[in-house]
Curated annotation (Swiss-Prot):
Chief location of this protein within or outside the cell: nucleus
GO BP terms: female meiotic nuclear division; homologous chromosome pairing at meiosis; male meiotic nuclear division; reciprocal meiotic recombination; regulation of synaptonemal complex assembly; resolution of DNA recombination intermediates; resolution of meiotic recombination intermediates
Bias type Polar residues, positions: 943-953
Residues in TPR repeats: 129-162, 432-465, 473-506
Organism: Oryza sativa subsp. japonica
Subcellular compartments: Nucleus; Chromosome
Region (Disordered): 248-269, 925-953
InterPro entries: Spo22/ZIP4 (IPR039057), Spo22/ZIP4/TEX11 (IPR013940), TPR-like_helical_dom_sf (IPR011990)
Protein name, entry field: TPR repeat-containing protein ZIP4
């Protein structure tokens, strides 16, 4: 009997009538989905409200039979409408729309469950359970495991005690619950539900097949999730699935005690496909467990059961990986060939298998594999080649052997042919990039030969169109650089010329300069440097690079020329690669390495001074410590160049260098005593070198030079107190004394060159110096000698200097008798020229008498021999003129002086006898009358010790 044939009960309570009316209207709206404008969300909400009301009514009083039948009729209509809606493409939508439809679907079994099981409806409980089962599957497909499980759990009690013919529904429910548990991550519950279903599945081969599929599905999920529960193993699940397949395929699998519903004989399902699928997944599980023998056993069983149809491609892949894992590369090679011959294998799968094989076999097998792929992959051959080459490159051990294998691989004509055509533009670019990157890695490792080989092969994948012009030029330039590094200079020049043809730019011009420099062709390098400067994309940075390259090649001229040209660009208000001061420093440093470059160094040092004045110290040299170092470098360089030029007697250069040093030292930290001390020294040295240049060139200083020298000395004089060291150190004090002397000496010299007489000022200058602690006898001797020379000698200054020299020297703890003797000689000469007391002979005699007093009592060798001989000879010879003039008294005085000096000086002993004889003869000739002045004019005792009185004959 059908539900529609049941007699309705018309005496319904009024409250139920309203609910039935609302339900009927809602069902009608669901049925008329094509013409109704009611939104699915509203339908779902209405059904939820009606279900809530019915549940409330059922809890207060049980439904009558007629009411239950009405609800069943409406619930069945609702289910049929839901099925129609699901089959309609008009309601297809996203996950949210499908969730609403699933909620409407679930309302049907919920209504039937509320209505209860009416009498006369066959298998009513099984139908409700089936509706819940299908509703749960809908939720499961949407990923709502909680709602799906709720549906399954409501359905299970309805059929758990069902008759034999309804146990199929219970099996389906258990399988669905197992799937839901697996999706929720509860693999243990899923396995328990599958185990609980074994008695149900034993009733028919189809049931066994369904359970086997359930085990396989849960096994796949477990394998994919790598479930950590040791009680649940994917291999066990796959084995269970295989056992069920075997039982289902057996003719005796159906129990005679449980005949099928309707009495029909069950058909044995085709389980070979399912078995092979189970074997594939079991092999995969064994492969993950690295049980390579287990993998191969599964594959053998699968292949043994295979008919004429093609095997699944994954079988070949797993077999190859298993052979690789067991170390049998020959069998792995065979499996790879078999896979490529399999028409079902996709190109992507073949390439992936080839990558795995090459990762184990190494680059030596790449050529064979790539040729096979070229024949196998018709549409994606270029992409396959790219993947294989990438695998070889990324395979590790990036040595030269691997690079050579790559080069041979990509240069094969069959491989290159795969990239022909406009459709492979992307693959060509990728292959070029792979080879380029590999080549640059070897370049960074300084394997230039290998790098050049790879870069050259990469050009096979660069088209000759306009878009690839820049890339081709880059390749040519890198090839040129590699050959430069290998010293294949002619070959490098060929490549850079090709690059220049493709894309003329400054990079090519610079490489030509580099090659010419390394070949030692400076003239060609000069020409190419001019070409480089004229390039449209000229960048001053390349002049800096040229200078560095020229210095490394010891090409002094090119380095200087490049820096000189670079220096000329700093006034153009353009960004420059390095500060102007750094260019000047490097240029001067280069010039200072070569002899005879003082003029050039001076020119650029002047430029530095001028730019410092124009821009300011910090703007030109920089601020902080760096700027201070730059400034000190120029100051020290000027000082050192001044010393070098002076040593080489290039006084014109030396004077200006010292003048520049003073300017640099005074330009920063003027309040610093150390800097002001250096300024003072530099100014004094500048004037000193000017005077030396005048003497060397024998050309008087100009009035402007004299004026400048006076100004510099005046400026230095104000700074002289700063020269003395704060802490007394012998060497520093000596240097300070020397500069004080030089200042005095130079000032004396310039005073003598002024237009007006300056004898008093000169004398006062020497007196001031003589009273200072810096004064030494040697300084006074030099001043005295200088004062006695020249066109306008200052005799007063000379006499004062020489006398002060003698006095100072005698007062020292260790008198320097060489200085004293020189001063005595000069003083004697002055006395011979001018008698300060009005008597020429008396002034000279006083000097000799002073000399006699000094030498008496000296140790042998203390007084210089040659000076002593000069004193004796000069004193003796002074008697010659008086003798001729018959001035016996004067002659006797000088002869006795010479004889007395000879007795006390070394080296005169041989002559004393002859001198004594001569003197005695003179006495006889001059007469016997006593000499009135003999006692008065005889030499007095030495101030340094006692002496015997000369014997008067």
């Amino acid at each position: 009997m059908k539900i529609s044939e049941l007699s309705p009960e018309y005496r319904e309570p009024p409250s139920h009538a309203g609910l039935i009316a609302d339900l009927s209207k809602a069902v009608s709206d669901v049925e008329s989905f094509a013409a109704s404008a009611t939104a699915p969300e509203k339908l779902a909400a209405d059904l939820r409200r009606i279900l809530t009301s019915l549940a409330s009514a059922a809890s207060s009083s049980s439904f009558t039979e007629s009411l239950s039948v009405q609800i069943w009729r409406l619930g069945t209509r609702l289910w049929n409408a839901v099925v129609d809606r699901a089959n309609s493409a008009a309601l297809a939508g996203g996950p949210a729309a499908l969730a609403v439809e699933a909620e409407i679907r679930q309302a049907a079994p919920e209504l039937l469950l509320l209505a209860g099981i009416p009498n006369g409806v066959p298998s009513a409980a099984a139908k409700v359970a089936s509706f819940f089962h299908r509703s749960g599957l809908a939720w499961l497909d949407l990923g709502r495991v909680d709602l799906a499980s709720a549906c399954f759990e409501k359905a299970t009690p309805l059929v758990s005690a069902a008759a034999t013919e309804d146990r199929g529904v219970l099996l389906e429910l258990n399988l669905a619950r197992a799937r839901a548990a697996s999706d929720a991550g509860d693999q243990a519950l899923a396995v328990a539900l599958l185990s609980r279903s074994k008695p149900l599945a034993a009733a028919s081969p189809e049931g066994a097949k369904s359970l086997a599929q359930g085990y396989l599905s849960i096994g796949e999920a477990t394998l994919a999730a790598k479930h950590s529960n040791p009680a649940v193993e994917a291999s066990t699940l796959f084995t269970e699935a295989l056992d069920l397949c075997e039982k289902a395929a057996s003719p005796s699998s159906s129990s005679p005690r449980t005949p099928p519903y309707g009495g029909a004989t069950p058909k044995t399902p085709n389980l070979e496909g399912l078995k092979r699928r189970c074997l594939r997944f079991l092999a995969l599980e064994r492969l993950q467990a690295q049980d390579y023998e287990g993998v191969l056993r599964c594959i053998r069983v699968s292949r043994a059961s295979m008919g004429l149809e093609e095997e699944h491609p994954s079988i070949g892949v797993m077999a190859m990986r298993a052979w690789i894992g067991s170390g049998n590369m020959a069998e792995a090679d065979k499996e790879l060939e078999r896979l490529m011959a399999n028409a079902l294998a996709t190109e992507n799968l073949c390439v992936s298998a080839a990558e795995a094989y090459l990762a184990a076999a190494g680059p030596e097998a790449a050529r064979k594999v790539l040729i096979a792929l070229a024949a196998r992959c018709r549409a994606g051959g270029a992409a396959a080649a790219v993947r294989v080459v990438k695998q070889v490159i990324d395979g590790g051990g990036g040595g030269i052997g691997r690079a050579r294998a790559i080069a041979e691989l990509v240069s094969d004509e069959r491989v290159v042919a795969l990239f022909d055509g406009p459709g492979n533009t992307h693959e060509r670019g990728t292959m070029h990039a792979l080879l380029w990157n590999c080549g640059t890695e070897h370049f960074r490792a300084k394997n230039y030969d290998t790098s050049a080989d790879l870069i050259e092969r990469s050009m096979l994948y660069v088209s000759r169109d306009e878009e690839s012009r820049s890339r081709r030029a880059d390749c040519f330039r890198v090839l040129s650089i590699c050959h430069i590094a290998l010293q294949h200079l002619d070959r490098a020049l060929e490549f850079v010329n090709e690059a220049y043809k493709v894309e003329p730019n400054i990079k090519c011009a610079f490489l030509k300069v580099k090659i010419n420099l390394q070949k030692g062709e400076e003239d060609e390098a000069f020409k190419q440097m001019k070409t480089m400067v004229g390039c449209v994309d000229f960048n001053p940075e390349f002049l800096t690079l040229t200078a560095h390259e020229a210095m490394s090649c010891k090409s002094f001229g090119v380095a200087v020329a490049s820096l000189s040209y670079l220096l000329g660009l700093y006034s153009a208000e353009r960004p420059m690669p390095m500060p102007e001061v750094a260019v000047l420093r490097n240029l001067i440093e280069l010039l200072s390495r070569e002899p005879g470059t003082e003029a050039e160094i001076l020119k650029y040092s002047r430029r530095a001074k001028q730019r410092m004045a124009d821009l300011g110290v910090e703007s030109f040299f920089g601020s902080g410590i760096v700027g201070g170092r730059e400034l000190n470098w120029f100051a020290d360089l000027s000082w050192n160049m001044g010393l070098r030029a002076s040593k080489e007697k290039k006084y014109n250069f030396g004077a200006e260098f010292f003048e520049l040093a003073a300017e640099f030292f005074s330009s920063r930290n003027a309040e610093c005593d150390e800097n002001r001390s250096k300024v003072c020294k530099a100014l004094i040295m500048a004037v000193t070198i000017m005077l030396n240049a005048e003497e060397l060139n024998n050309s008087p200083l100009s009035d402007s030079d004299i004026k400048k020298g006076v100004e510099m000395l005046s400026r230095a004089g104000k700074l002289l107190p700063l020269i003395s060291p704060s802490v007394p150190v012998a060497s520093d004090q000596l240097e300070a004394n020397n500069f004080l002397y030089l200042h005095t000496f130079n000032s004396y010299q310039l005073m003598g060159r002024m237009g007006t007489p300056a004898h008093p000022q000169q004398l006062q200058l020497i007196k001031n110096f003589a009273s200072s602690k810096a004064c030494t006898p040697a300084n006074l001797l030099t001043l005295g000698v200088t004062a006695s020379k020249g066109a306008l000698p200052n005799m007063l200054a000379a006499e004062f200097s020489l006398k002060a020299c003698i006095t100072t020297a005698l007062a020292s703890q260790s008198p320097n008798y060489r200085v004293i003797s020189c001063a005595l000689r000069k003083l004697a000469c002055l006395a011979g020229l001018q008698d300060l007391n009005g008597s020429k002979s008396d002034a000279a005699y006083d000097v000799f008498q002073q000399a006699y007093q000094i030498v008496v009592g000296l140790k042998e060798g203390e007084y210089p021999v040659e000076e002593g001989q000069w004193l004796v000879a000069t004193a003796w010879n002074m008697s010659c003129l008086p003798l001729r003039l018959h001035q016996a008294k004067v002659a006797r005085k000088w002869m006795k002086m010479g004889l007395d000096l000879a007795r006390h000086l070394e080296g005169m002993k041989e002559r004393i006898a002859s001198m004594q004889t001569t003197f005695e003869n003179f006495e006889r000739v001059s007469g016997d009358e006593p000499d009135e002045c003999s006692q008065e004019e005889a030499p007095k005792a030495s101030i340094s010790g006692s002496m015997s009185q000369p014997v008067l004959v």
